[in-house]
Amino acid sequence: MAEAAGVPAESLAGCRARAARTVLDQVVLPGEELLLPDQEDGDGPGGAGERPLRLNAAARSRGRVVCGPGLRRCGDRLLVTKCGRLRHKEPGSGSGGGVYWVDSQQKRYVPVKGDHVIGIVTAKSGDIFKVDVGGSEPASLSYLAFEGATKRNRPNVQVGDLIYGQFVVANKDMEPEMVCIDSCGRANGMGVIGQDGLLFKVTLGLIRKLLAPDCEILQEVGKLYPLEIVFGMNGRIWVKAKTIQQTLILANILEACEHMTADQRKQIFSRLAES
């Protein structure tokens, strides 16, 4: 214990820090600090060729670094706050930087700013609607947060309606706040979802899988029946087909496809297409 007490804090911090490029697509744990390679200075605290990730003006020439879910800025480093796999997406310009986030598996949804979610209106308090989004507390939604809404022209929102919107405020110290308009004031598909259709819940991992650009599941589902579908990052899916039977079939397929292989999905889709 005496030897451990004599170790400088800087040495302990250096032991915790790891190079982000060496742990991409690997499991990271809460409390770990991430470093990125710095070509300008090879003698950093992370070892040869590594130094702390700079998030100030000095790093702008190397590209902007965006801190996604599961990561938090801690001085000039990134601190891991969730257990999961570290992911990275290169910027379109190819100038370095990009988006870093932790792909984690969790049951309860934690609101994230910019996420599009499906909520259920549970109450109306003055000019504010309370919306259940599956988090630890309901989100607030102003009646002015709809396209074309004014004090005289109020949106027709009732308790029990389904709302598709996005978060503009989402952090641990404030109540989540939703809007149904984009930065240009347009609805862009957001607002009250139709009365018909079926709402069901899936895992957060399946939602991310279905929303991936190279997802083949949606392409195969779209060939079966004409449908309307809305995905919420909070694990909720709303789907509507021509008949109730088709709607139930689509919901069952989407729920079951998470644990299916590609061959199993092809067999099911071929059988449904024949019938």
Swiss-Prot record:
UniProt-listed SUPFAM superfamilies: Eukaryotic type KH-domain (KH-domain type I), Nucleic acid-binding proteins, Ribosomal L27 protein-like
Protein task: Non-catalytic component of the RNA exosome complex which has 3'->5' exoribonuclease activity and participates in a multitude of cellular RNA processing and degradation events. In the nucleus, the RNA exosome complex is involved in proper maturation of stable RNA species such as rRNA, snRNA and snoRNA, in the elimination of RNA processing by-products and non-coding 'pervasive' transcripts, such as antisense RNA species and promoter-upstream transcripts (PROMPTs), and of mRNAs with processing defects, thereby limiting or excluding their export to the cytoplasm.
A GO cellular component entry from the record: cytoplasmic exosome (RNase complex)
Recorded GO MF terms: RNA binding
Cross-linked sites for Glycyl lysine isopeptide (Lys-Gly) (interchain with G-Cter in SUMO2): K151
InterPro entries from the UniProt entry: Exosome_RNA_bind1/RRP40/RRP4, KH_dom_type_1, KH_dom_type_1_sf, NA-bd_OB-fold, RRP40_KH-I, RRP40_N, Rrp40_S1
UniProt record, GO biological process: CUT catabolic process; DNA deamination; exonucleolytic trimming to generate mature 3'-end of 5.8S rRNA from tricistronic rRNA transcript (SSU-rRNA, 5.8S rRNA, LSU-rRNA); isotype switching; nuclear polyadenylation-dependent rRNA catabolic process; nuclear-transcribed mRNA catabolic process; poly(A)-dependent snoRNA 3'-end processing; positive regulation of isotype switching
UniProt keywords, alphabetically: Acetylation, Cytoplasm, Exosome, Isopeptide bond, Nucleus, RNA-binding, rRNA processing, Ubl conjugation
Top-rank taxon: Eukaryota
The protein's assembly and partners: Component of the RNA exosome core complex (Exo-9), composed of EXOSC1, EXOSC2, EXOSC3, EXOSC4, EXOSC5, EXOSC6, EXOSC7, EXOSC8 and EXOSC9; within the complex interacts with EXOSC5 and EXOSC9. The catalytically inactive RNA exosome core complex (Exo-9) associates with the catalytic subunit EXOSC10/RRP6. Exo-9 may associate with DIS3 to form the nucleolar exosome complex, or DIS3L to form the cytoplasmic exosome complex. Exo-9 is formed by a hexameric base ring consisting of the heterodimers EXOSC4-EXOSC9, EXOSC5-EXOSC8 and EXOSC6-EXOSC7, and a cap ring consisting of EXOSC1, EXOSC2 and EXOSC3.
Stated name of the protein: Exosome complex component RRP40
TM stretches of this protein: none
Main localization of the protein described in the UniProt heading: cytoplasm
Family of the protein in this entry: Belongs to the RRP40 family.
Subcellular location, record wording: Cytoplasm; Nucleus, Nucleolus; Nucleus
N-acetylalanine sites (modified residues): A2
Protein's UniProt keywords contain Acetylation: yes
